């Protein structure tokens, strides 16, 4: 497996990262070792990643939201998780998990179906998701992409 987790630096950076992916080899001991969650938020923690399954050579997008203990006691949900592919700097949505199962007291997560990363070996992949939280009648929604991309196969 060739897997490269790169910081987002625009289309040129994505092309450079794709070129570097052919020379960088990371061999995790399990599929979960390749997950690198990017998170933010204090009272409500929002996290997302592109997960690599070494056995099947596939990517999938994952997102989760958690009401942090000692925070504001929010209800939370995550929706519209997307796995995006970036061929030549263009964005193409490859998989979507809508996950409209409602509000949750402490946490929610969603995962897209997988895609064969070897079909597009030089493209970078990103995750985007919509995170929502509410307390009483007041609620907030944020759609977020971690400032990272993944290249692999």
Outline where the language-model segments fall.
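Secretory targeting and sorting signals
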Residues: 1-33
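Post-signal peptide N-terminal regions of Sec-secreted extracellular proteins
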Residues: 32-153
């Amino acid at each position: 497996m060739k897997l490269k987790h790169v910081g987002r630096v625009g289309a040129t950076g994505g092309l450079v990262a794709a070129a570097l992916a052919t020379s960088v080899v990371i061999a995790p001991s399990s599929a979960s070792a390749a997950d690198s969650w990017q998170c933010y938020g204090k009272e409500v923690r929002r996290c997302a990643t592109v997960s690599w399954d070494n056995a099947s050579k596939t990517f999938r997008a994952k997102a989760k939201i958690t009401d942090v203990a000692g925070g504001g006691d929010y209800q939370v949900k995550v929706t519209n998780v997307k796995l995006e592919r970036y061929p030549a700097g263009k964005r193409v949505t490859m998989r979507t998990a809508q996950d409209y199962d409602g509000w949750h007291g402490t946490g929610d997560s969603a995962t897209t179906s997988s895609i064969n990363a070897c079909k597009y070996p030089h493209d970078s992949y990103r995750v985007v998701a919509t995170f929502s939280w509410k307390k009483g009648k007041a609620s907030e929604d944020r759609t977020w992409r971690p400032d990272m991309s993944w290249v692999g196969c």
